């Protein structure tokens, strides 16, 4: 039977799921309808649509995982449920993280200005760079799945023991193996985090350089390019903030699971972990002019619909 803490956890998890689904379904529908209408798909729309689809899948896995953890946590002691759910969660998390990183890099190449020949060469081949990064992420996903298989096997061996403390005192080998595998999984998450941080830093340097050039030429500090820099920086910075919360929550959740198992503390740490797939869609909507304008029109129509007087009953 679910306790009060379980009910609170499930309520918060459901709220995160609804928020995330609203934003990502909106992004997917708008971009798909625009692509069908224009018979052309731009790179940014393709990345946004793939990110929305990946996040929707991630949110569905998260909801199922939260229901199992809150209502039937004993199922995770068996390999039949735990292995496929954990694999699907990590795959969806990996794809969502890398697609968000590719989007940050895309905005960096699209908006930043550097006279360096290497930057110009990469910018000219921006679509190829994004394709290479996505291909690299697929190879890393295979490596991640192999490491995760070993991680699940080792953790299930520990869960099968009736006394975890006695077992760890008798032999440190399983715990050491889990720690090593956890480090490998963390390094795999660190790569997109570093790329996103690097994109933000270079965007900031480009903004500083562009603003200084405008002041030297007596054109002021506000023009279309400067505003584009600032909008991109706000969006990437917001994504990076959620990314930081997501990254560190992932590390804390995994280490807490290794030490304490699947208990109440681990449950509520995962709520912070799920903030990234739940909230980043609204940052993307605010940062994209087409999505933002469509959202404003939709809210305006909803507002007018709610204000419409109800017809009198006959």
UniProtKB/Swiss-Prot annotation:
Residues 29-50, 123-127, 209-238, 287-314 are cytoplasmic. InterPro entries: TAS2R (IPR007960). The keyword Transmembrane applies. One of its GO terms (molecular function) is bitter taste receptor activity. Residues 1-7, 72-101, 149-187, 260-265 are extracellular. Coiled coil: none annotated. It is found in: Membrane. Glycans are attached at residue 163. The chain crosses the membrane at residues 8-28, 51-71, 102-122, 128-148, 188-208, 239-259, 266-286. It is a multi-pass membrane protein. GO terms for cellular component: membrane; plasma membrane. Receptor that may play a role in the perception of bitterness and is gustducin-linked. May play a role in sensing the chemical composition of the gastrointestinal content. The activity of this receptor may stimulate alpha gustducin, mediate PLC-beta-2 activation and lead to the gating of TRPM5. Belongs to the G-protein coupled receptor T2R family. Most taste cells may be activated by a limited number of bitter compounds; individual taste cells can discriminate among bitter stimuli. This is Taste receptor type 2 member 42. It comes from Macaca mulatta (Rhesus macaque).
């Amino acid at each position: 039977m679910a306790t009060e803490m379980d009910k609170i956890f499930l309520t918060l998890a459901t709220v995160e799921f609804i928020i995330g689904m609203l934003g990502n379904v909106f992004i997917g529908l708008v971009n798909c309808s625009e692509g069908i209408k224009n018979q052309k798909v731009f790179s940014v729309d393709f990345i946004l649509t793939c990110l929305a689809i990946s996040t929707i899948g991630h949110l569905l896995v998260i909801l199922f995982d939260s229901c199992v953890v809150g209502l039937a946590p004993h199922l995770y002691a068996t390999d039949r449920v735990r292995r496929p759910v954990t694999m699907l969660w990590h795959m969806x998390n990996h794809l969502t993280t890398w697609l968000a990183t590719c989007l940050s890099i895309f905005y960096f190449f699209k908006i930043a200005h550097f006279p360096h020949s290497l930057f110009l060469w990469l910018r000219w081949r921006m679509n190829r760079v994004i394709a290479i990064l996505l291909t690299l992420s697929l190879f890393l996903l295979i490596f991640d799945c192999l490491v995760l298989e070993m991680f699940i096997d080792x953790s299930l061996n520990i869960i099968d023991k009736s006394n975890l403390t006695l077992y760890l005192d008798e032999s440190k080998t399983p715990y050491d193996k889990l720690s090593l595998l956890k480090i490998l999984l963390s390094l795999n998450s660190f790569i997109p985090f570093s790329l996103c941080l690097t994109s933000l830093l270079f965007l900031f340097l480009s903004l500083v350089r562009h603003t200084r050039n405008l002041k030297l030429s007596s054109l002021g500090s506000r023009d279309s390019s400067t505003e584009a820099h600032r909008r991109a920086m706000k969006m990437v910075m917001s994504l990076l903030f959620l990314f930081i919360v997501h990254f560190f929550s992932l590390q804390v959740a995994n280490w807490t699971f290794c030490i304490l198992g699947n208990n109440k503390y681990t449950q509520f740490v995962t709520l912070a972990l799920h903030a990234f797939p739940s909230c980043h869609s609204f940052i993307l909507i605010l940062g994209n002019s087409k999505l933002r304008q469509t959202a404003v029109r939709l809210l305006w129509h909803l507002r007018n619909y709610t204000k419409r007087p109800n017809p009198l009953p006959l």
